[in-house]
Amino acid sequence: MKTIMIRDDVYKKLLEIKGDKSFSEIIEELIEESLSVRRKKIEKYFGILNEEEARGLAKEIEEMRKRTDEDIARKLSNY
């Protein structure tokens, strides 16, 4: 078990919605709802790229990451 601190206004909001449930149950439900909403937002984008487009995009992202890493390493080496 852990102790957490929350603002008074957040506590009052949780108190309003908790009913007979524990704060842990309410927080867990809110987290699950949030994750569910996030999954649904992400799922709507599945399948919008064909295989070739997806590979091309992945390659571009990898190249951008490599350039960014190189740029950061170069800048850090100047210190």
Curated annotation (Swiss-Prot):
It comes from the Archaea. Keywords: Toxin-antitoxin system. InterPro entries: Put_antitoxin. Possibly the antitoxin component of a type II toxin-antitoxin (TA) system. Its cognate toxin is VapC12 (Potential). Belongs to the UPF0330 family. NCBIfam families: PRK13696.1-3 (NF010251). This is Putative antitoxin VapB12. The gene is vapB12.
